[in-house]
Each structure stands twice: as C-alpha cells, then as structure tokens.
Amino acid sequence: MIITANEVINRLPIAKTFDVSKITPQIDSVIRQYLKPRLGLEFYEAINTDRISLGAGTPFAVYAPATAYTQGDTVIFNNVAFECIETPPAAGYNPTQVLYWQYYAPFTTAKYRDLWITGGLFDFVCNAVMIETIPFIHLNVQSAGLSVLSDNFGNAATTQDVERLLKTFAERTETAWNQVYNFLTLVNDNLNINNPVLYPLFAENC
C-alpha cells in the first residue's frame, strides 16, 4: 500500500492517538478516487511498486531504545520510517525528538522520494484520506441506525463543524495537488530541471 495510517497521523495536525482502524479502510478509497484518476494507472503502479514495505521484511530496522543511532540511520517507529538527521547525545532519543529525526519517504528510487515530499504527493494523499475518514468518525454507522459519536472530554462536533473541517481538508487537498502537478510538469533550464522527462509516465507528460 502506498501509505500507512500511521503516516497520515504523523503528518497531519490530528491526535497522535487517533484510531488507525478508522483511517486504513479509507486509503483504498483514496487510491481509487484520487490517485489513480489524477496520476494515471501506469504512473500510480510505478510509484506504488517502488514503495518500500514497512511491514515484515522491511529493510529498515525497528527502532530500539537501547541502540545508539548516528546520523543517516533509518528506522521504523510506529509503522513510520524515520531518518536520523543528527547524532543524538545518547541512546533513547526516539523519532519523536525532532532535533534528531525526520520522516523518511520509504521509496527505493530518489525521484519518487522527491515527488513524495518536495512534490507534495504525501500531503495530497494525507489530506484526501481525511476527507474520506471524517464522516465515519463523526457518525457511528450501525445496523440499528446512525448515531453521532461523542467525546467524554468535550462536546461532539456539530454538522457545521464537520462541514467546515471537510472544506478545510478539501482545500488543502487541492492545494497539494496543484503542487504535485506543477512539480511533475516543471521545466527550468537555468536549474537543469526537466521533470516531464524524469516522470514520463504521468499522463500530462506522455
């Protein structure tokens, strides 16, 4: 799969204790409705094939608190890949310590890592996932009917609150897509950039 629920949670300004089971089913929907139509099936498959699995058999070691990591090390922490960007002063500095770690785009090929982060594809996918997820965290869908979920530590969001949040994520999704599109079609002779040649499978570059 091109993204994990934990990556979405790590990227967006949402509770880090968010229930991943609410997000995971919506990733397939985003792939079908957002990614494949906009990227084109062949290009999407090329990106997805280049993706490094974060499950069993991943080339990255799982973060170990007792290990003394150094700059350049890559680990898996809560099913998200991180790269050590500065050697911590001692063992035990886990990837939540942003002075020493940053998110690592888990792709084999540099051009896809660049597209994922610099090109904005990561943000596009994350925000689209939330568009599909929010209705199912506001409403509890049961065979007996629908009910509004409540929070023991606050008030449940109103329909207007949900609509406003959905609008925000929709705007963020389209902003991210514009970034993706501009990146994939970018030509800059002064900087020796010709992304249509670098990403020939993108439908607009064919």
Residue ranges and their predicted role:
Residues 1-65, 70-73, 78, 87-122, ...:
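Conserved short "hinge" loops at termini or chain/domain junctions
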Residues 164-167:
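Long, hydrophobic, well-ordered secondary-structure blocks that form the structural core
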